[in-house]
């Protein structure tokens, strides 16, 4: 009989232990839930504070007074003399800096980041160009001149300070289309480890009055902040053509943009870590003000490649391709007289397509010769179309 009581007592005690464990687990889960709810409550409190807090007023610093107060031009209208909050670093308060004011006491509570126009921001090449001088054929003299003007002042400015001369501020590359002007600019940016800012001059021609000049100004400001940097202005004749008085609003806006570009070229130090490279196919129509000393001092012609240059360019492109061993570079160069570097690249691509159509994985000499013939026919057709257009226009 006593054994039965012992069994019942043992069973009840084990149930109690199990119940205690369940209650402990329940308490732990409730504690976790309470902690999550507390975090959620704090989050919503912070969001409520954000929504109920009054908006700040944007202003631009005009001057810093001797007593530490600041003269600002507020976006709401008047100029104000305001104090600076204690948590703001006084070194950040400079003329031209954007700040945020509270609405009650007009105290500077925050220094706003530098504003950048989206159009200007997209001009910057974030990744460094991967073009090297070894990928450019037949332009040894042009590379030498470009390195002297752009790369040397960026890497060793002390040489020019010691001698007492200022290097050219800008370089103008001119020549027929497809001769490698853009590749030269990218190569010098690669070798000098500089930020490459590529812009086509037609992007400066904006719809509204003053927009083009503002973009030019902000472009140069960004280049100074990102220094060392290289600004490459392609097709500069789009805004740099000779000024003529035809009276249209569009022409006047382009002239204002050109004048802003000239002012920016005049306004920076040649030994600063910013260099300007411009390119054009039509140097004959450029405004003389662009070409005068002190702006684009070094003017470099990038001509069509000669026999040796074409041989080098063919060698550069064919080294990257699967070709047969019997390729005669001299013959290819002879057959492609008058071709630019871009034309030679097209020849190599066209030859590769011919091999692909025939189911081969190697390019033959015949493919290259046929490709030259095909490109030549296209070039002749384009020239004849141009002649007919000029005749009947």
Swiss-Prot record:
**Which UniProt key words apply to this protein?**
ATP-binding, Chaperone, Coiled coil, Cytoplasm, Nucleotide-binding, Proteasome
Q: Which gene encodes it?
A: pan
Give the protein's biological function.
ATPase which is responsible for recognizing, binding, unfolding and translocation of substrate proteins into the archaeal 20S proteasome core particle. Is essential for opening the gate of the 20S proteasome via an interaction with its C-terminus, thereby allowing substrate entry and access to the site of proteolysis. Thus, the C-termini of the proteasomal ATPase function like a 'key in a lock' to induce gate opening and therefore regulate proteolysis.
A GO molecular function term, named singly, is: ATP binding
Can you say what this protein is called?
Proteasome-activating nucleotidase
Q: Which HAMAP family match?
A: PAN (MF_00553)
Species, as recorded? Saccharolobus islandicus (strain L.S.2.15 / Lassen #1) (Sulfolobus islandicus)
Q: Which family does it belong to?
A: Belongs to the AAA ATPase family.
Q: Which GO terms describe its biological process?
A: proteasomal protein catabolic process; protein unfolding
């Amino acid at each position: 009989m006593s054994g039965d009581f012992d069994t019942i007592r043992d069973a009840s005690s084990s149930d109690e232990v199990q119940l205690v464990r369940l209650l402990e687990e329940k308490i732990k889960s409730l504690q976790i839930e309470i902690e999550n709810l507390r975090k959620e409550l704090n989050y919503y409190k912070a969001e409520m504070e954000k929504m109920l807090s009054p908006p700040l007023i944007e202003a631009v610093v005009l001057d810093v007074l001797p007593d530490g107060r600041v003269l600002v031009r507020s976006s709401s209208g008047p100029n104000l003399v305001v104090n600076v909050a204690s948590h703001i670093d006084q070194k950040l308060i400079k003329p031209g800096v954007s700040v945020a004011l509270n609405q009650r006491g007009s105290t500077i509570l925050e220094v706003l980041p530098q504003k950048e126009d989206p159009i200007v921001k997209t001009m910057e090449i974030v990744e460094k160009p991967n073009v090297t001088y070894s990928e450019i054929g037949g332009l040894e003299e042009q590379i030498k001149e470009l390195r002297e003007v752009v790369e040397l002042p960026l890497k060793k400015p002390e040489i020019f300070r010691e001698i007492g001369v200022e290097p050219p501020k800008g370089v103008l590359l001119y020549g027929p289309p497809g001769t490698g002007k853009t590749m030269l600019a990218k190569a010098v940016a690669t070798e000098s480890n500089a930020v490459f800012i590529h812009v086509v001059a037609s992007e400066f021609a904006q719809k509204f009055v003053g927009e083009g000049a503002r973009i030019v100004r902000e472009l140069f400001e960004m280049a100074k902040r990102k220094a060392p940097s290289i600004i490459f202005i392609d097709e500069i004749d789009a805004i740099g053509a000779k000024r003529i008085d035809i009276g249209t609003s569009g022409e006047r806006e382009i002239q204002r943009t050109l004048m802003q570009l000239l002012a920016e070229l005049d306004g920076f130090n040649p030994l600063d870590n910013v260099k300007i490279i411009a390119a054009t196919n039509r140097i004959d129509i450029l405004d003389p003000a662009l070409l005068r000393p002190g702006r684009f001092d070094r003017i470099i012609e990038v001509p069509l490649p000669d026999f040796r240059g074409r041989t080098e360019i063919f060698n550069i492109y064919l080294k990257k391709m699967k070709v047969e061993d019997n390729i005669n570079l001299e013959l290819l160069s002879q057959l492609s007289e008058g071709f630019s570097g871009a034309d030679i690249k097209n020849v190599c691509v066209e030859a590769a397509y011919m091999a692909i159509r025939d189911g081969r994985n190697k390019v033959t000499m015949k493919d290259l010769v046929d490709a030259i013939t095909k490109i030549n026919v296209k070039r002749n057709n384009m020239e004849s179309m141009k002649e007919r257009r000029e005749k009947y226009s």
